[in-house]
Curated annotation (Swiss-Prot):
NCBIfam families given in the database record: rpmH_bact
Family: Belongs to the bacterial ribosomal protein bL34 family.
PROSITE patterns named in the record: RIBOSOMAL_L34
Pfam families hit by this protein: Ribosomal_L34
GO annotation, biological process: translation
InterPro entries registered for this protein in UniProt: Ribosomal_bL34, Ribosomal_bL34_CS
This protein's UniProt keywords: Ribonucleoprotein, Ribosomal protein
Protein's UniProt name: Large ribosomal subunit protein bL34
Membrane-crossing segments per the record: none
GO cellular component, one term: ribonucleoprotein complex
Amino acid sequence: MKRTYQPSRRKRVRKFGFRARMATRGGRAILRRRRAKGRRKLTVSDEKKPY
């Protein structure tokens, strides 16, 4: 049986990236909460590229 996590950069960014968050009201709420909390990384788009 294969594992449930099959990583894909493109899928990850499209689902959890900054533009995806900004596209919906709920997503903007997430960003607002993370900013209020002082997160250095708001979305997966803010990650340092490992290559």
